[in-house]
């Protein structure tokens, strides 16, 4: 259930701090194609060179990667939008070879691991993204949120997930309803139902007029009222979800 409420680095590329992954913004494909073309052209025509090793007359061929870390990341994002996940993984890893501390490459690998259900890998990558970013880096908001969802989906470290989500809210004012939604799910799992309802209703109040966003929040309210045994509110949310599904 949490997989469509994580941030993706494709969202950050649009120039805002973030947009919700539902699913998803990306670097323009045309731009990505240009990068791919540049990579192929440069690899074939520019980066292949011969080094002669003195009087022995030996020669070796060395290929040099012409792309920088950020270009590998953009190319990885293009592959992700096309569903070519393994190629995306290769590009993110190439970015890390060029820049071992690049937080967005770690974040991209974390998201792919998360979607595959490889939560330990996702947790490690998200933690690396956080460690490699400055404490006041606004991108940390999405790193914190996604790490929170690892803890939610594995039902562990829920208090830590709460702390991370609260830190995300401080870094990203615009994403408030997303983090309120995440908090609502955390409180539901902690059986703090009053706090869960307050957070989810606040998220609903601040949600844009977007059916996907509204559906996610209402699904969480649906689960909350089911656990509470609140039949009236459960029925109300059921009808609302039917309307949103039309």
Language-model-detected regions and their locations in the chain:
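TPR alpha-solenoid repeat register
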Residues: 71, 105, 139, 143, ...
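Register position in tetratricopeptide repeats
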Residues: 81, 115-116, 153-154, 189, ...
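Short coil turns that delineate tetratricopeptide repeat
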Residues: 66, 100, 134, 138, ...
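Residue-level recognition of tetratricopeptide repeat
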Residues: 77, 111, 149-150, 185, ...
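Alpha-helical adaptor scaffolds
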Residues: 135-198, 205
């Amino acid at each position: 259930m949490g997989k469509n409420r994580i941030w993706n680095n494709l969202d950050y590329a649009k120039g805002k701090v973030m947009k919700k992954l539902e699913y998803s913004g990306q670097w323009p494909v045309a731009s990505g194609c240009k990068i791919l073309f540049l990579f192929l052209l440069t690899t074939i025509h520019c980066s292949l060179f011969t080094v002669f090793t003195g009087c022995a007359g030996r020669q070796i061929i060395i290929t040099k990667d012409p792309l920088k870390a950020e270009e590998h990341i953009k190319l990885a994002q293009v592959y992700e939008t096309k569903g070519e996940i393994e190629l995306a993984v290769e590009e993110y890893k190439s970015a890390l070879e060029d820049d071992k501390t690049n937080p967005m490459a770690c974040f991209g690998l974390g998201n792919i691991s998360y979607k595959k259900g490889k939560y330990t890998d996702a947790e490690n990558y998200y933690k690396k993204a956080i460690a490699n970013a400055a404490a006041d880096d606004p991108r940390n908001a999405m790193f914190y949120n996604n790490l929170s969802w690892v803890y939610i989906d594995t039902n562990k470290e829920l208090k830590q997930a709460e702390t991370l989500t609260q830190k995300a809210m401080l870094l990203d004012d615009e994403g408030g309803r997303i983090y309120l939604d995440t908090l609502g799910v955390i409180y539901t799992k902690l059986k703090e139902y009053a706090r869960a309802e307050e957070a989810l209703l606040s998220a609903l109040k601040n949600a844009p007029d977007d059916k996907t966003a509204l559906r996610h929040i209402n699904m969480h309210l649906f689960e909350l009222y089911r656990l509470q045994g609140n039949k009236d509110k459960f029925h109300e949310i059921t009808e609302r979800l039917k309307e949103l599904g039309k």
